[in-house]
């Protein structure tokens, strides 16, 4: 199977994304010679990886935008029959050490969310994975109000991390952005700042967009 050539420009990326609208995941997978999993319990990232491949994304797991040359991050978003997001959206790993002097403008969250191509996909569990269809894509750039909300949450979360209070941060913190354990394996550990300024071991954390925020974004477009 030949790799997909990355899109040369934004209009080519949007054209590819729009061509997928209404098509089932099984059709896309068959076109690429990929087996559709029975369910997503062990293949949680399968849908996103399939869409990335079909669109010619370049980043893989690197900490940069999926289409770095276009300044675009790709996010698949599972939705229900009413078009509402079914789960939070992973943004990136949260830094837990060496964060002195890190500003919102220089953060990976800010970088990743400058411009996002949202690709909605049917996600209700009663629909077999292969039969789930891709929705109409949305190219989103945060407005000033959205950026302010994201920055405020990020700064509050990072301040608590800097004070060694990462364990006190729950998914309830933040209006639009939350911090959650990232590793599938709860035994996975990484270094973080301790309350005495030293280092301690904790579970890796990731930044996620809350569903109320992504629902608002989808609603602005689809109503």
UniProtKB/Swiss-Prot annotation:
This is DNA mismatch repair protein MutH. The gene is mutH. Keywords: Cytoplasm, DNA damage, DNA repair, Endonuclease, Hydrolase, Nuclease. Belongs to the MutH family. InterPro entries: DNA_mismatch_repair_MutH (IPR004230), DNA_rep_MutH/RE_typeII_Sau3AI (IPR011337), DNA_rep_MutH/T2_RE_sf (IPR037057), Restrct_endonuc-II-like (IPR011335). It comes from Shewanella sp. (strain MR-7). It comes from the Bacteria. It is found in: Cytoplasm. GO terms for molecular function: DNA binding; endonuclease activity. Sequence-specific endonuclease that cleaves unmethylated GATC sequences. It is involved in DNA mismatch repair. GO terms for biological process: DNA modification; mismatch repair. One of its GO terms (cellular component) is cytoplasm.
């Amino acid at each position: 199977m030949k790799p997909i050539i990355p899109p040369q420009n934004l209009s080519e990326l949007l054209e590819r994304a729009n061509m997928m609208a209404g098509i089932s995941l099984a059709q896309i997978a068959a076109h690429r010679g990929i087996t559709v999993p029975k369910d997503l319990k062990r293949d949680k990232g399968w849908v996103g990886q399939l869409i990335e491949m079909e669109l010619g994304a370049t980043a893989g797991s690197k900490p940069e935008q999926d289409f770095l040359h276009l300044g675009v991050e790709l996010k698949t978003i599972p939705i229900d029959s009413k078009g509402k997001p079914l789960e939070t959206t992973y943004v990136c790993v949260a830094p837990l050490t060496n964060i002195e002097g890190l500003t919102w403008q220089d953060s990976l969250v800010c970088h990743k969310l400058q411009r996002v191509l949202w690709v909605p996909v049917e996600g209700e569990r009663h629909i077999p994975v292969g039969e789930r269809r891709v929705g109409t894509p949305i190219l989103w750039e945060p407005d000033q109000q959205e950026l302010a909300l994201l920055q405020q949450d990020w700064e509050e979360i990072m301040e608590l991390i800097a004070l060694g209070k990462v364990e006190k941060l729950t998914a309830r913190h933040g209006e639009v952005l939350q911090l959650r354990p990232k590793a599938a394996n709860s035994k996975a550990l990484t270094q973080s700042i301790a309350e005495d300024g030293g280092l301690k071991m904790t579970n890796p954390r990731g930044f996620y967009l809350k569903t109320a925020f992504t629902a608002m974004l989808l609603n602005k477009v689809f109503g």
